[in-house]
Amino acid sequence: RDSSTSRGLGDVYKRQGVISTAQIGFEEPDFVGNEEACNLRSIRKHIVRAKELASGKGMIAVNVMVALQQYREHVKEAVRAGADAVICGAGLPVDLPELVEAGKAKIAPIVSSRRAAALLLKTWDKKYGRTADFIVTEGPEAGGHLGFSREQLDDISKIRFEEELTGIMEEKKKYEEKYGKQIPVFAAGGIWDASDAKRIEALGADGVQAATRFVATKECDASLGYKKAYVNAKETDVKIIKSPVGMPGRALNNAFIQKTERAPESVERCYHCIKNCKPAQIPYCITQALIRAVHGDVENGLVFCGSNVGKIDRISTVREVIEDLMYEKEVKMP
C-alpha cells in the first residue's frame, strides 16, 4: 500500500498505488451513525480523485479486508468506481471472483504461506474457473494485521518467509499454464530500499510492495503528529499486539497500547467495521483508536507500522521513497 487515500496516490508517479477501504469515510461530516454510506461514498471519491491526479497513468488498486462487515459492498463499489485492481487480505477472499466480473478489474489475494495460496488458487479454479491476476505475499515484518500466529511472530527468525515466497511462485505455475497468462508475485513486509527489492526479485518475485515509508511523506494525508510518531520511533518501540480484529498486528508500543493491555477501554458505540466483533469482549474499539491516531492524538490511539519504522528519520516525499526503491539511482523519474 503506497498511501492510504487519494492525495498521496496521485504522486505515486505512473506506478501502482493502493487505497485502503477500511473505514475510509471517517472524515465525512456524517460518518458517526452513517458509517456504511460514508465508506461507500468515500471509496468512489478517492478512486476518482486518485485517477485524476495520476492523469490516467499507472494503476489504482484498493485493499479490502475480508474481515470487514462491508467487505462485499466495498469490493463491488470499488469496481463500479473504476478501480484497476482489488487486493484482499485479513482473511482468505474465497469469493472474490464472484464479486468482480472477469475483465472489470484485476483480482489478487494477500497471502503469507504457500498453503494459503494453494488453497485459494484451487478454490478459485474449481468454483469460478478463474485465477489470480497477481499475488501479494506478505512477510512477518509488515505493519498492521499479520497472517501469522502470535507464537510465530514472537521469533520471526524461525519463519522461513523466503521459502514460502518461492513455494508460492512454484504453486502458481500450474495455473499460469492452465490459464495461459503470467501471475506476478509481489513481496511485502520489511521492504526499505533497492537492496531489499533486489534481494526479493533475485528469488524470482516480480516486484515489491511498500507502505511504512510512504506514511512519513509530505503527500500522505495523515496528521503531522502521526508522521512524527514514525519519525521519532525507535526499533525498540515496535511491538506485536493482539488486535480487536482477532489477529496479531505490528504497532508502536505507545501509552495507548500499554494502557489497554492493563485494562480494556470502554467501548461506547459500534462503528460496524469488523464481522465478528463483540464490543463487550474487546480491549478497545479499533475504529476509534485508529481515527484518534491519524488525527494526531497518537498517545491515545493505535499506530500500526512496519518493522523498519525505526529507520525513518525525517519526513520525505513520495518521489524520494520511490527513487530509493528503484535499482538505478541515476535514472530519475520524470
Predicted regions and their residues:
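Hydrophobic faces of well-ordered beta-strands that scaffold small-molecule active sites
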Residues: 1, 15-19, 60-64, 86-88, ...
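Single conserved hydrophobic/aromatic residue that forms the stacking wall/gate
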Residues: 2-9, 13
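Glycine-rich, proline-tolerant flexible connector loops at the mouths of alpha/beta enzymes
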Residues: 18-39, 142-152
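Alpha/beta enzyme core
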Residues: 68-183, 194-195, 199
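Conserved active-site-proximal phosphate/metal-binding subdomains
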Residues: 142-186, 192-334
